[in-house]
Amino acid sequence: MSEIPGDLKFLKSHEWARVEGNGRVTVGISDHAQGLLGDLVYVELPEVGADAKAGEQIAVVESVKAASDVYSPISGKVVEVNSALSDKPETINEDAYGEGWMFVVELTNAEEVNELLDPDAYAEALENDDH
């Protein structure tokens, strides 16, 4: 498993959130998740302007093996999407925590970030996972 960046927060469902410091949060799926899914062939991103609600499905990633819902780790308005993923969904496989980001949300409740798992807690959740 690759190194988990220390500046990220996570959901147990393998989404990550990076607080950008300007009230915005970049979201993607973890390296662990892309590894389980295998080669991604399709990404369905939210629309810019869509309302994101913490813990609710907002996007879909599809691989040759399975389709998987992506849940928003925080609530807010989607202000940017990584449209490059439409043509190159495999970018998530190649760089899950960098170029493979999925969308950016403008936070409505900064407290929600504190409810997410830190990298150590996420690593522990992975160890206890039955996968």
From Swiss-Prot:
Cite a single GO BP annotation. glycine decarboxylation via glycine cleavage system
Q: Where does the Lipoyl-binding domain start and stop, copy by copy? A: 24-106
Pfam families per record: GCV_H (PF01597)
- Residues that the record marks as modified (N6-lipoyllysine) are K65
The cofactors named for this UniProt entry are: (R)-lipoate
| SUPFAM superfamilies found in the cross-reference section | Single hybrid motif
* Cofactor: binding comment: Binds 1 lipoyl cofactor covalently.
Cellular component GO terms, alphabetically? cytosol; glycine cleavage complex
- Give UniProt keywords alphabetically: Lipoyl
Q: Which PROSITE patterns match?
A: BIOTINYL_LIPOYL
Q: Which PANTHER family match?
A: GLYCINE CLEAVAGE SYSTEM H PROTEIN, GLYCINE CLEAVAGE SYSTEM H PROTEIN-RELATED
Give the UniProt family note. Answer: Belongs to the GcvH family.
* The protein's assembly and partners: The glycine cleavage system is composed of four proteins: P, T, L and H.
Q: What does this protein do?
A: The glycine cleavage system catalyzes the degradation of glycine. The H protein shuttles the methylamine group of glycine from the P protein to the T protein.
Q: Please identify the protein, giving its name as recorded.
A: Glycine cleavage system H protein
Q: What is the species listed in this Swiss-Prot or TrEMBL entry?
A: Stenotrophomonas maltophilia (strain K279a)
UniProt lists the gene as gcvH
